[in-house]
Amino acid sequence: MLLLDYDGTLAPFHVDRSLAYPYHGVVSLLDNIMRCGKTRVIIISGRPIVELRTLLTPMSDLEMWGSHGLERQLSDGSYSRVQVGEEDAASLTEAEEWVVAAGLLSRAEIKLGGIAIHWRGLPPAEARKVQALTQEGWGPLAERSGLKLLQFEAGLELRVSHPDKGDAVRAILADLDTEVPIAYLGDDLTDEDAFQVLEGRGLSILVRAAYRETIARAWLRPPQELIAFLEQWRSDVGG
């Protein structure tokens, strides 16, 4: 089984998130791996599933967990989602109101179960200003509400504490034979939850140009080492 984060793992970051398409060769490799019939391929991302569908259009039968596990699309196209609790929803509404008042709406991404502020593409001084302002505005709200304030590559996200990517992996493992080999590839701090769940069960791989502290067992630098890993997997399953 192959579990894959999207942004920063299968695709390079892009100022315009709608243009963050996979690295060249990734889609065809994943398609080949799936067609062999020996590997279940699953995307686990913070992105909404509707965006993943667009960016991975050729792979319409791909299983996806979106919004950190709040949404799920099976390979047959069936879709389900977890409802956000009333208290969390009220806290997220408060966070959105703060975004508007702070003049950061153009930098905001409002999504199921969370709100993200992006500063990719800004000059360094302005990016630091946006980061500090967001931290100052959302930090107290996170502390009193129980929401998670998470830093990712060039942004901060305030979101519900559960489910997270670790919960998604845990749910997948619950229906999986313990003898099935499994690997999870991810790049940022939200993937650490998934790495932790895989401890003693599968291979956790950090995919990132520059190494950072992680509990992952291996490190790949994209795109070359990522492509080489997928090519080896394809070869191993007979593709």
Residue ranges and their predicted role:
Residues 166-239:
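Mg2+-dependent phosphoryl-transfer enzymes with acidic/Ser/Thr/Gly-rich catalytic loops
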Residues 21-111:
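Active-site phosphate-binding/coordination module
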Residues 40-42, 63, 148, 183, ...:
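A structural signal for isolated positions on well-ordered beta-strands in alpha/beta enzyme cores
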Residues 1-16, 43, 169:
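Asp-based phosphoryl-transfer active-site loop
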Residues 67, 74-90, 144, 150-178:
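Substrate-recognition "cap/lid" segment bordering the active-site pocket of phosphatases
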Residues 106-124, 146-159:
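Charged, glycine-interspersed solvent-exposed loop segments at helix/strand-loop junctions
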